[in-house]
Amino acid sequence: MCIPENMWTPPTLPLPLQSFPKENIPIDKRTQKCLLQIKKLCSTQFSLNKEYKSTFNLIDYKLQRIIQPHNLSVNPINSFWPHTVERLVVPPIYYEMLSNQQIYTLDYLQINPQYHIPIKSVQKSKQKAFQLNLLPLPRQKFRQIQLESYMPSKLESKMTSICEESLPKTVIFDYHGYFDLKQKLLTSNTLLTARLNPISTSAGCRQKLKFTTHWPSWTIEINTDISNISRLHKVLFDENFNKIELFKLASCNLKVERSTRIKKNHIATWKLDKLQLKELDWDPLKKLKAYSVQKKINCDEVHAQATFIITPLKLVLMPINSSEIHILQNNYGNIVISAKSFGNLQPKNTIESSQVSNNNTKLLKEARTTGSSMSDRSTSITSYKCSSLVPEKRSLLDSNLISIVQLKKLRTSYPQSTESHSGEMSLLRLLHSNSCKTEIQQIDTWYDTAKLNTTPKTTSFKLEGQDIKKKVSIIANEYDISTTYQITRLLRERQYSNIEEYRIKLPCHFILSFSSCLLLVEISKVFQCITAGELFLERTLSILIKHFRVVHVFIEYEPNTELYDKDIFWKAKLILNNPQVRTIFIPKFSNNLTTWMLRVTTIQGQKFQEMVKDNTLSHFNINPYQEYLIQEKLRESSPSRLIETLVFGDHVLDGILTPIHINSLKIFARENWHLT
C-alpha cells in the first residue's frame, strides 16, 4: 500500500513495546472512567486539510485563523465542530493505525523539535494541542439534584420582582388646609448619590428599570382637639422664635407680564435674634428726612424740602370680657408699658356715689351765685381758655367739667319712665335759667323717685371692705387639700363662712357657679411636661373644658420674676390661649384672689344647704349648682324623672349642662333605666 506524498505519516513505535506480556491490574472506578474517556477520544477522527504540508510550520497563517475554534459550549467528545470551514477526514487506510497509536503520536509530537512547536512545559503543550484541535476540550460534570417545589415560597417570587429603588428628592407635607402656607419644594444635592443598588436574584437576569417624575407625598392627620395647644407648644419651645413674627404680614406675589422670561424670586421667611435686633439701627425714615427735590424755575435753582405724610396704622383690638377689665386696664397701673411687666392686681378706688353727690352740691351752689352771670350771653369767646390745651393741665380735665360729666352719666344710667318724664330737667336748661330755686327742687324730686323706682345699670364697686349681704356659697373641692385649705382660711378671716366642702372628681380647686370653676397653678408648673410632648396643664384643661364653660386659671408668680424673666408672662399667656380659659396673674401671698372670689360668686341669694337636697346627679360629675338649677327648672319632677325625659329627646337642659353631661345621662338612661 503506497502512501501519498502530501499526506502526513505518523511515526512507528519500536518493536519491544509490543512484546510486553499482558497483566491484570486492579483499577478503581475513577481510573476506569478516565480510561473510558480516553477510549472515546481515540475513536475520534483526526481532520487535516489536504493543503497541509508534512510539517506544521508550513501551514498558512490565514488557514490557521480559520481552523481555530471559538469559545462556544460544544461537546468536546463530538468530533464535528460547527464553526470550522470544512470537515477534514483522515482516509480509512490510516484510521486503524491512528486509533491504536494516538497517545504515542501525541507524545512524539510534543517531543520532536522538527515541527517547531515551542514546548516549555507539559501544560503549555496541551494548550497548544487544544488550539490545533488535536485534543478536545475537557469538561467537568457535576451532579445536580433537581427537586420539584410543590409549595414555592413567596419570598423568592418577590425577590425576582424587586426593582431598583431610589430616595425621593422632595418632601411634601399636606396639612388639609389648616395652614394657609404655600408648599415649597426642598431640593438637596446630597440625595443624588444615595441610591439603593439593585438586588441580583439570578446571574443572567436583567430587569428594565423605569424612572418616573411622580414623587410620593405623605399626609399628616392633625388631631383637632389639641391642635391649637400642640401648635403653641411647638412655637413656645422654639429657640429661634421671636415675638416679631407674630406681627408679620403675609406679602403676596404680583404677576408681572413681560416679553422675556425672568427667574422667580422665592420669598423666604426671616428670623433675627434679640441681640441682632438691638444692634440694628431701626430708623426707616432716616433717609426720607434728608431727601430734597431740585427744581429749575427761570434758570434759578430752588431747593425745596419734600414733606412726607405718614398715616398711622389702625389697630383692631379684641373684645375683652367684663370680668377681666379690672386686671387689664392700664388706669389701675397693672401693666407697665415701658418696663414690659405686670404690676399689682389691687385696683385703685373708683369714683364713688358719695363723691358724685358732693360734686352735685358744689355745682348747685355755684349755679345759685353765678345764675345771673350765665344768663348774660354777651361774654366774648376769647375770654375763655381751653383747659386741655394748657401745658400745666394736659393730664386731666377741669374739676368743674368732671362734675358735669358725672351728672350726665348718672342721668343716662336711669331708665326714662313715663312717671318721672315730666319732672326731668336737662342740665343745659339748669345752667342757662335765671330761677335756680325751682330747678333745684325739680332735680331733687327726680333723683328721689328714680332711686325708689329702679336701680342704675352700671354701679361702681369697691373690692376692699365690701359688705356681702347675700348668702352666697362657694364649693371647695378636695382636689388639692393643702391649697384649698389656705384659701378657705383667708376667706374665713374676712368673715365669710358660706363655704361647702365636696369631693368631686374634677381637677379644680373651687367651683364658683354652674358654668365656671377656679384653678390655682404656680408659674413654674405651666412649662412642665408629664411625658414627651405633653404639658402638665394640657390634660387638666382638656377635662375642665368639657365640664365647664369658663375656666379661671390663676397663675401665682414671685415678685422677682419680673426682673430676671420678663418673657415668661406672654409665653404662659400664649400657651393658654383658649376662648374658654381666662388667665390671670397674681403675686404670691396676696389677698387679691379672695377679693376676686367674693365679687364674682353669686347665686340666687340662698344658702347652699337649703337649695341642694338630692345628690343623685353627682355621679355624672354634675356640680351642685347645676343640680339646683335643674330642680328650679323642673320642680314638679325628680332627678330620676329627669333621666326619663332625656330618652324622649328633651332639650330643656342645654343651657345648664354641657354636651358631655347630656350624653352621659342619655347613655345611662338607655342602658340601665327601666320604665315602669
UniProtKB/Swiss-Prot annotation:
Keywords: Cell cycle, Chromosomal rearrangement, Chromosome, Chromosome partition, DNA-binding, Meiosis, Nucleotide-binding, Nucleus
BP terms from Gene Ontology: chromosome segregation; meiotic cell cycle
Keyword Nucleus carried by entry: yes
Subcellular location(s) per record: Nucleus; Chromosome
GO molecular function: DNA binding; nucleotide binding
GO cellular component, one term: nucleus
Known function: Required for initiation of meiotic chromosome synapsis. Involved in synaptonemal complex formation, a structure that tethers a pair of homologous chromosomes along their lengths and plays a central role in recombination and homolog segregation during meiosis.
Protein family (similarity comment): Belongs to the ZIP2 family.
Protein name: Protein ZIP2
